[in-house]
């Protein structure tokens, strides 16, 4: 059984494993992040290691997930089209969400690397 953790990041919950890549939504400009910057997630909801499961209420104490920013990126453009019937008017807008691609390096619980 692989070791994994469930963390809260970017307003959503993610199941993460060491050595894998993930995209997390950001609410800050891309210019504030740079490549290979270390990042630590302390909001760990659950850790599963071999046959042991640790649950937090709501978060686990002394649990962290360490990772590195691989690169910031922007998602595909979403088109919002609003049309008012019988008025012959419409409005078209676009939006691109900012993401941060990161790689998870390790999962720590009680100062032990799992």
Curated annotation (Swiss-Prot):
| Gene Ontology molecular function | rRNA binding; structural constituent of ribosome
Cellular location(s): Plastid, Chloroplast
Gene Ontology terms: cellular component: chloroplast; ribonucleoprotein complex; ribosome
Task: Name the UniProt key words of this record, in alphabetical order.
Answer: Chloroplast, Plastid, Ribonucleoprotein, Ribosomal protein, RNA-binding, rRNA-binding
Q: Which GO terms describe its biological process?
A: translation
Under the heading InterPro entries, the entry gives:
bL21-like, bL21-like_sf, Ribosomal_bL21
- SUPFAM superfamilies hit by this protein: L21p-like
HAMAP family from the xrefs?
Ribosomal_bL21
Functional note: This protein binds to 23S rRNA.
Q: Which family does it belong to?
A: Belongs to the bacterial ribosomal protein bL21 family.
Q: How does it assemble?
A: Part of the 50S ribosomal subunit.
Designated name of the protein: Large ribosomal subunit protein bL21c
Q: Which organism is it from?
A: Staurastrum punctulatum (Green alga)
Gene symbol of the encoding locus: rpl21
């Amino acid at each position: 059984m692989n070791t994994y953790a469930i963390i809260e990041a970017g307003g959503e919950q993610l199941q993460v494993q060491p050595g894998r890549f993930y995209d997390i939504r950001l609410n800050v400009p891309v210019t504030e992040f740079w490549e290979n910057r270390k990042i630590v997630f302390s909001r760990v909801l659950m850790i599963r290691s071999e046959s042991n499961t640790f649950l937090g209420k709501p978060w686990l104490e002394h649990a962290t997930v360490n990772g590195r920013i691989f690169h910031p990126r922007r998602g595909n453009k979403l088109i919002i089209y609003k049309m008012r019937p019988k008025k012959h008017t419409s409005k078209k807008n676009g939006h691109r969400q900012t993401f941060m691609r990161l790689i998870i390096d390790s999962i720590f619980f009680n100062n032990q690397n799992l």
